Amino acid sequence: MRVNVTLACTECGDRNYISTKNKRTNPERVEMKKYCSRDNKHTLHRETK
């Protein structure tokens, strides 16, 4: 079962991306390095509720 998740920047808190994940194979929160336009660099983005 795939669900939509929102990814927020860990440095500025801006919610920049929407992605999907499979809850059965990845029950924990998703973390990805993505580009943050507010910080103008690649930062760690975490799944938010």
From Swiss-Prot:
<dbReference type="Pfam" id="PF00471">
    <property type="entry name" value="Ribosomal_L33"/>
</dbReference>
<dbReference type="InterPro" id="IPR011332">
    <property type="entry name" value="Ribosomal_zn-bd"/>
</dbReference>
<dbReference type="GO" id="GO:0006412">
    <property type="term" value="P:translation"/>
</dbReference>
<keyword id="KW-0687">Ribonucleoprotein</keyword>
<dbReference type="GO" id="GO:0005737">
    <property type="term" value="C:cytoplasm"/>
</dbReference>
<protein>
    <recommendedName>
        <fullName>Large ribosomal subunit protein bL33A</fullName>
    </recommendedName>
</protein>
<comment type="similarity">
    <text>Belongs to the bacterial ribosomal protein bL33 family.</text>
</comment>
<dbReference type="InterPro" id="IPR018264">
    <property type="entry name" value="Ribosomal_bL33_CS"/>
</dbReference>
<keyword id="KW-0689">Ribosomal protein</keyword>
<dbReference type="GO" id="GO:1990904">
    <property type="term" value="C:ribonucleoprotein complex"/>
</dbReference>
<dbReference type="InterPro" id="IPR001705">
    <property type="entry name" value="Ribosomal_bL33"/>
</dbReference>
<dbReference type="GO" id="GO:0005840">
    <property type="term" value="C:ribosome"/>
</dbReference>
<dbReference type="InterPro" id="IPR038584">
    <property type="entry name" value="Ribosomal_bL33_sf"/>
</dbReference>
<dbReference type="GO" id="GO:0003735">
    <property type="term" value="F:structural constituent of ribosome"/>
</dbReference>
